[in-house]
Structures are given as structure tokens and as C-alpha cells.
């Protein structure tokens, strides 16, 4: 698929990648932004810049509620941009206010099976919500809490263990034109 077709079909609309931690939002966001010739932002990195500390430190020092507030502030700023791919935090969908910002763009859910998430996150010590707990059970609980919210996305991309990041980006680029025609004019930001 050629880049100009992808770019034109989006008409400058930003793309929000949604999904669980470990679903590949940051990696895929960078690749997708290059293919679309868009800018790329990762909300977790921006939150760390705004707070002047790592996410884990925000959770420890100030709690999850403060982190979620920072997350909303960053999302509010990003939602006004066009031609941008945004990797969101896994819990971005939990706060109702965030949906008003997410609806400014095309929301894509990276639906990764629990077994793959567990495999990817087993050695990751940087995720505050996974500390001092049974990884499988915690991820299963988080996924159950969030699955219905993720399903509100405009597009669902099912990821398998065999998919490379490039394969997944190709799935996204192929699927975008199937949902763009269904957008309401008030959602199309040129």
C-alpha cells in the first residue's frame, strides 16, 4: 500500500493507539507514523517530561490518581494536533473525560491475547501496576476491566504471536480505509 493513499484517506486525522501494556503501542506507533508521514508521541514519555520523574515514581510518590490526571492533561494537549500518531497508556480508556479527547482522532485497539502479554511483560520491572503481584492474574484482571472500553475503538487489530511489528502496521494500513468512510464530518479535522 503506498503512503500517499494512507495519508490521503486519513485527511490529517490523528491516530490514537489503544491497548494493554505490552501490546506494542510505542513500537507500532513509531513505525506507523513513519509510514503515514505523521509525527509520533508516546503519552507515557510526555507524562514523565511534564512530571520530571519516571511513571513508577509518580505512582509511588503521588499515587495513581495523580498519574491519571497528568495523563488527561497530556491527552488534552495532543488531541488538538493533526497528522499525529499517539501511543496511549493502557489505562487511558478508564477515565470518561479522556474519551472526549480520543474521539478527535481514529482510535485503534491493538488486541493482544493474554498469553502474549504475559510473555512480553514477564521481565519488565518498570510497570507500577504489575509490581508485587501475580503477573498472569493481574493482567487478566486489567484486561477484563478494560476490554469493553477498548472495544469502543473505531478499529480493532487482532495481534497474533506470529505477527511482526511490520505485519501489524500493514494490517492497520489495510484496515484504515474500511472505517474512514464511516466517520462523521464533525470528527474529520483537516
Curated annotation (Swiss-Prot):
Q: Which domain of life is it from?
A: Bacteria
- Keywords in alphabetical order, please: Amino-acid biosynthesis, Aromatic amino acid biosynthesis, ATP-binding, Cytoplasm, Kinase, Magnesium, Metal-binding, Nucleotide-binding, Transferase
Report which reactions are catalysed by this protein.
Answer: shikimate + ATP = 3-phosphoshikimate + ADP + H(+)
Identify the residues that bind ATP.
22-27, 127
Q: Name one GO cellular component term.
A: cytosol
Name of protein? Shikimate kinase
The record's function comment reads:
Catalyzes the specific phosphorylation of the 3-hydroxyl group of shikimic acid using ATP as a cosubstrate.
Query: What does the record note on quaternary structure?
Result: Monomer.
User: Where located?
Assistant: Cytoplasm
Q: Gene encoding this polypeptide? A: aroK
Annotated cofactor note: Binds 1 Mg(2+) ion per subunit.
Q: Which GO terms describe its biological process?
A: amino acid biosynthetic process; aromatic amino acid family biosynthetic process; chorismate biosynthetic process
Task: List residues binding Mg(2+).
Answer: 26
- Record lineage: Bacteria, Bacillati, Cyanobacteriota, Cyanophyceae, Oscillatoriophycideae
Amino acid at each position: 500500500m503506498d503512503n500517499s493513499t494512507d495519508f490521503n484517506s486519513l485527511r490529517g486525522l490523528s491516530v490514537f493507539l489503544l491497548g494493554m501494556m505490552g501490546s506494542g503501542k510505542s513500537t507500532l506507533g513509531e513505525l506507523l507514523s513513519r509510514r503515514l508521514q505523521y509525527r509520533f508521541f508516546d503519552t507515557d514519555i510526555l507524562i514523565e517530561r511534564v512530571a520530571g520523574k519516571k511513571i513508577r515514581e509518580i505512582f509511588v510518590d503521588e499515587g495513581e490518581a495523580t498519574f491519571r490526571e497528568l495523563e488527561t492533561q497530556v491527552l488534552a494537549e495532543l488531541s488538538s494536533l493533526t497528522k499525529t500518531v499517539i501511543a496511549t497508556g493502557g489505562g487511558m480508556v478508564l477515565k470518561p473525560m479522556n474519551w472526549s479527547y480520543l474521539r478527535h482522532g481514529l482510535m485503534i485497539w491493538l488486541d493482544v491475547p493474554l498469553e502474549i502479554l504475559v510473555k512480553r511483560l514477564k521481565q519488565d520491572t518498570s510497570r507500577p501496576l504489575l509490581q508485587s503481584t501475580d503477573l498472569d492474574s493481574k493482567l487478566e484482571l486489567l484486561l477484563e476491566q478494560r476490554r469493553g472500553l477498548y472495544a469502543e475503538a473505531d478499529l480493532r487489530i487482532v495481534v497474533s504471536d506470529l505477527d511482526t511489528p511490520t505485519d501489524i502496521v500493514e494490517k492497520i494500513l489495510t484496515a484504515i480505509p474500511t472505517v474512514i468512510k464511516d466517520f462523521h464530518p464533525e470528527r474529520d479535522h483537516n
